[in-house]
């Protein structure tokens, strides 16, 4: 099921269509105008059931505020009147912002200005009917989002993790080459790192969505285990990216001089990291790591080569994390 519909139409689009159909059906059965309920239903479909409920709690009172101002200013200025539309929109935005209901402001304003032409003299009826239709849209969309095609981001998360890891390994290898060639300030590496961090941030967002969704679906022990493994992998990737950024973002106008032994050690480690992409295996170089450790130990606390010590230390931390990931099993 997950495979065929995603190639044609997304699950969230399907749920939006279903919520729109059911909402309009219920409203028509109750002889209510469905447009306001549909607006609420469409914006209530969120990436997770938790997000739908959380934002729904704020969208409903925001819609009530919009309907209230529409009725109030229609009563004061009448319809048609430019002042009715202006003050309805303006005060709806102001009050929603003041009450921290920004997530519902758009729907509240649309509801407010759209209902003005149909109010006439039926002030109370229109107010309560808009309240009822908004509630129908909110509840219907929330149930659809909870029951129909619960979001599963596992495959997307794992694909993102694999993509970010390969990009990270390539960037580490190329950055080591730049350092050995004396290119300490690199716009190319900066750009690649920014793109990498974008993928990592997206992965962490999707992981958060999946965690929120699982809280509403009990008895999913296998999925919790899978999510835990994904979260641990994502956490290590974040650490690796942090250490990698520390050898990319260096002070301007620095100059590092590596000994021949240090250069050979860095080359061996960077090649081993780059080979993970092909072999999915990290070949440790204990002697190279020992060489770099000795270089760090020889430097004094306030040595003029402290930046060099910092760079080598970050390389060793990346080496240690990868060694633990691929060899401590």
Swiss-Prot record:
Organism, as annotated: Staphylococcus haemolyticus (strain JCSC1435)
Family in the record: Belongs to the UPF0421 family.
InterPro entries the record matches: ArAE_1
Pfam family, one: ArAE_1
Compartments where found: Cell membrane
Protein name (Swiss-Prot/TrEMBL): UPF0421 protein SH1063
Residues that span the membrane, as ranges: 25-45, 60-80, 87-107, 108-128, 131-151
A single cellular component GO annotation: plasma membrane
UniProt keyword annotations, A-Z: Cell membrane, Membrane, Transmembrane, Transmembrane helix
Keyword Transferase applies: no
Keyword flag Ribosomal protein: no
Main location as per UniProt: membrane
Topology within the bilayer: Multi-pass membrane protein
Domain of life: Bacteria
């Amino acid at each position: 099921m997950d495979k065929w519909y995603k190639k044609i139409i997304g699950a969230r689009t399907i749920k939006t269509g279903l919520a729109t159909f059911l909402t309009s059906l219920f409203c028509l059965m109750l002889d209510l105008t469905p447009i306001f309920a549909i607006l609420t239903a469409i914006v209530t479909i969120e990436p997770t059931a938790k997000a739908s409920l959380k934002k729904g709690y704020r969208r409903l009172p925001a819609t009530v505020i919009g309907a209230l101002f529409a009725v109030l200013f229609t009563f004061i200025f009448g319809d048609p009147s430019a002042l009715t539309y202006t003050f309805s929109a303006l005060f709806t935005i102001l009050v929603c912002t003041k009450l921290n209901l920004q997530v519902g402001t758009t729907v509240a304003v649309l509801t407010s200005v759209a209902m003005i032409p149909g109010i006439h003299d039926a002030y109370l009826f229109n107010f309560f009917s808009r309240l009822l239709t908004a509630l129908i849209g909110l509840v219907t969309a929330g149930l659809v989002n909870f029951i129909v095609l619960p979001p599963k981001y596992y495959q997307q998360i794992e694909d993102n993790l694999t993509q970010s890891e390969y990009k990270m390994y390539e960037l580490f290898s190329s950055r080591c080459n730049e350092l050995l060639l004396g290119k300490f300030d690199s716009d190319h590496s900066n750009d690649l790192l920014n793109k990498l961090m974008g993928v990592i941030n997206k992965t962490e967002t999707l992981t958060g969505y999946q965690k929120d969704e699982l809280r509403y679906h009990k008895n999913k022990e296998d999925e919790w285990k899978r999510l835990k493994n994904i979260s641990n992998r994502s956490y290590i990737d974040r650490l690796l990216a942090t250490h990698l950024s520390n050898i990319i973002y260096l002070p301007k106008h620095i100059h590092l001089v590596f000994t021949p032994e240090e250069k050979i050690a860095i080359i061996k480690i960077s090649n081993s990291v780059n080979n993970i992409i092909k072999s999915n295996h990290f070949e440790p170089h204990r002697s190279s790591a020992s060489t770099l450790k000795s270089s760090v130990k020889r430097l004094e606390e306030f040595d003029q080569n402290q930046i060099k010590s910092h760079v080598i230390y970050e390389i060793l931390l990346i080496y240690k994390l990868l060694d633990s990931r691929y060899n401590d099993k």
